[in-house]
């Protein structure tokens, strides 16, 4: 055990990221296939995925209470799970990039969306929703937003995203964020 747990920590982190990717991909696939599914089938599958996210969240909580070296690396995943559970973000791709702390890819996605809006491939409402999500994620990752982006965010951020940002800033500590995410899961089940 000369690595003093570094190898194990690295492998655990990789496994957790893969699990989060799988769940986010499942949510994204579900949204893409929504038209092909009847309402009950869609709701049931979404409920199952949210339950899996909740179980994953519980696992993270147990890991964090026993292994403090993982706390910083897992905090991004926690916020992504919180966003997915509370449905603050509607776009699984944004959640995944946020969890992996990939601001460059978020900015690339934003540029692609702006282009798609200009050529008519993306509706304005969907563009606005996804742009707000991406800008909020970038802000939470500590990225500097332009004055135009800040103005866009102020004008278009909904109550749910504002609450997500406020809560994630105020709570800060992993246990409190997990407690809120757990509460949101319970609320979503009702």
Curated annotation (Swiss-Prot):
GO molecular function, one term: beta-catenin binding
Matches recorded under Pfam families: ICAT
Domain of life of the native organism: Eukaryota
Keyword terms of this UniProt record: Coiled coil
UniProt feature coiled coil, ranges: 2-63
GO biological process entries: response to ionizing radiation
SUPFAM superfamilies in the record: beta-catenin-interacting protein ICAT
Signal peptide: none
InterPro entries from the UniProt entry: ICAT_dom, ICAT_sf
Assembly and binders: Does not interact with CTNNB1.
PANTHER family associated with the record: BETA-CATENIN-INTERACTING PROTEIN 1
Family: Belongs to the CTNNBIP1 family.
Name used for this protein in its record: Protein LZIC
Species classification: Eukaryota, Metazoa, Chordata, Craniata, Vertebrata
């Amino acid at each position: 055990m000369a690595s003093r747990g570094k190898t194990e920590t690295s492998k655990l982190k990789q496994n957790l990221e893969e699990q989060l990717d799988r769940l986010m991909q499942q949510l994204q696939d579900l949204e893409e296939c929504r038209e092909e599914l009847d309402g009950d089938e869609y709701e049931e599958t979404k409920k199952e995925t949210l339950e899996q996210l909740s179980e994953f969240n519980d696992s993270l909580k147990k890991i964090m209470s026993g292994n403090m070296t993982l706390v910083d690396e897992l905090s991004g995943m926690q916020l992504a799970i919180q966003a997915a559970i509370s449905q603050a973000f509607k776009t699984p791709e944004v959640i995944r990039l946020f969890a992996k702390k990939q601001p460059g890819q978020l900015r690339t996605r934003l540029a692609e969306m702006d282009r798609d809006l200009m050529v008519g491939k993306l509706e304005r409402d969907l563009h606005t929703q996804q742009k707000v999500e991406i800008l909020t994620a970038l802000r939470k990752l500590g990225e500097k937003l332009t004055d135009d982006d800040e103005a866009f965010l102020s004008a278009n951020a909904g109550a749910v995203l504002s609450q997500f940002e406020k809560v994630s800033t105020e709570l800060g500590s992993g246990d409190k964020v997990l407690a809120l995410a757990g509460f949101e899961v319970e609320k979503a089940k009702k």
